[in-house]
Structure formats: C-alpha cells, structure tokens
Amino acid sequence: MFKVIKQEGRARRGGFTCPHGTVQTPVFMNVGTQGAIKGALSARDLKEIGCQIELSNTYHLHVRPGDELIKSLGGLHRFMTWDGPIL
C-alpha cells in the first residue's frame, strides 16, 4: 500500500510496503535486464549504496535463461541473489 509522507504543491514523498521490504519514493531503480546489474555489483554492494528495489525485465528472463530454469533455482529472488523488492 502506498502512503504519502509529505506533499508540497504537486510533488509528494511517500513509500510503499511489499512482501520483501519498504520502498521510499521517489526512488531510483537499478535495472537488471537479465537478472543482473551491469558493472559486476553484488547484492551487498547494492544495499551499501542504498538500492531499495531492482527492476527486472521479465521478457528478457523468459527468453533467456527461461522460466523453468529460474523456477528450478528457487525463483527470481534467489536467481538474482536479491532479498529486496523487485519490480
């Protein structure tokens, strides 16, 4: 659920809670096109720089490596070694 924390004019600051964590908005989302962030950053590195959420392109993951492989490895969070929210 999204909750507005502060509003000034048409701008607003808020947050939403998901099963894997809370995300404060506005937010910058790192893009893991095929389940990985370019630049060889680890999940720990991402947490250290304040990454709250990762964006993952499900179409690219469906094409390669494929849904069944991701499922057999324990799902997208385990495949990406990311315990936070994923969009």
Where are these regions (language model features)?
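Non-catalytic, usually N-terminal nucleic-acid engagement modules in DNA/RNA processing proteins
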Residues: M1-L87
